[in-house]
Each structure stands twice: as structure tokens, then as C-alpha cells.
Amino acid sequence: MSDGQKLTHIDASGEAHMVDVGDKAETVRVAVAEGFVKMKPETLALIRDGNAKKGDVIGTARLAGIMAAKQTANLIPLCHPLMLTKVAVDITEDTGLPGLRVEAMVKLSGKTGVEMEALTAVSIACLTIYDMAKAADKGMEIVNIRLLEKSGGKSGDFRRQES
């Protein structure tokens, strides 16, 4: 494994530790992640029409994703607590699944990236959709949660290339 591929959360003795970012330069960091909730067409219609028993599925899931991004350091042991400057969660209908596509964009000016915050936002938004619609469709699937892009920081930019 080259230095560029070294696991940063593992020290020389193989123990997990929180990375010291104190000497790193502050840069603007942005990460975008996505995930999907596949469901029956009838369940998608129920959500679209605002008829889910628990209320506004999309609005609630959007808020849950935003809240989750802000709590990432409390959920993932070695993540730094961050002062996020922007979290946006967009949930759109994808009739091809059928289901919902969840995208989260997280931004800050700081010393460490926000990939985990974007992925956490997507994960919790998807789980919230499942929770709020499970009475209608227990067979829903949460799929393809992944980082789409990140910018800023020493490791440079990343953009997922689709084949």
C-alpha cells in the first residue's frame, strides 16, 4: 500500500486513533452522496400524494438527513465534530426504480473532509423514508449509498465515474 493509500485512522502499532488535523490548512470542503429507496409503485404514489399514515415522508426525511449530518461525530467513533456551513438534502422521485433518490451535499471551511457527513445524511434520510412508509411496504430496499464527489483538502478532488 502506498503512502497515498495508507489508512489514516490506524497508528504504527495497528491501533485505531483519531487523526490529528491541527496542523492542516483550512480549505473549503464539499461532499455529495446519494442513495436510493426502492419500493412498490403504490407506495411511491402514497408518498407522492401525501397519504402516508405518518405524515410528510419527504419533508421529514429531508430534516432527518440534515440533523444526521450534524450528528455524525456522535455516531461514527473517529469522526471529528465539525462546524458545517451547509447541508442540503434533496429527495426526488425515480419512477424507474420505482422509488426515491436521496442526495446530500455538505460543505464547510475546515481541516477535514465532510464525506462521512454526506453519507450519514443520505443513510438516515433513507432509513427515515423506510420507517415512515413501512406500514405500506415492508419490502422496500435501501440501495447504492455512495459518495459521488468530494473537493478540497490534501487528498484532492474525487468524482465518481459511471461506466
UniProtKB/Swiss-Prot annotation:
Binding, substrate: 78-80, 116-117
Key word Lyase present: yes
InterPro entries, per this entry? MoaC (IPR023045), MoaC_bact/euk (IPR047594), MoaC_sf (IPR036522), MoCo_biosynth_MoaA/MoaC (IPR050105), Mopterin_CF_biosynth-C_dom (IPR002820)
CDD domains from the UniProt entry: MoaC_PE
Task: Please write the reaction equations for the catalytic activity of this protein.
Answer: (8S)-3',8-cyclo-7,8-dihydroguanosine 5'-triphosphate = cyclic pyranopterin phosphate + diphosphate
GO molecular function annotations of the record: cyclic pyranopterin monophosphate synthase activity; GTP 3',8'-cyclase activity
EC number(s) per entry: 4.6.1.17
Q: How does it assemble?
A: Homohexamer; trimer of dimers.
Q: Which family does it belong to?
A: Belongs to the MoaC family.
Role noted for this protein: Catalyzes the conversion of (8S)-3',8-cyclo-7,8-dihydroguanosine 5'-triphosphate to cyclic pyranopterin monophosphate (cPMP).
Its name, as the record gives it, is: Cyclic pyranopterin monophosphate synthase
Q: Which organism is it from?
A: Agrobacterium fabrum (strain C58 / ATCC 33970) (Agrobacterium tumefaciens (strain C58))
Q: What is the lineage of its organism?
A: Bacteria, Pseudomonadati, Pseudomonadota, Alphaproteobacteria, Hyphomicrobiales
Gene name, Swiss-Prot/TrEMBL: moaC
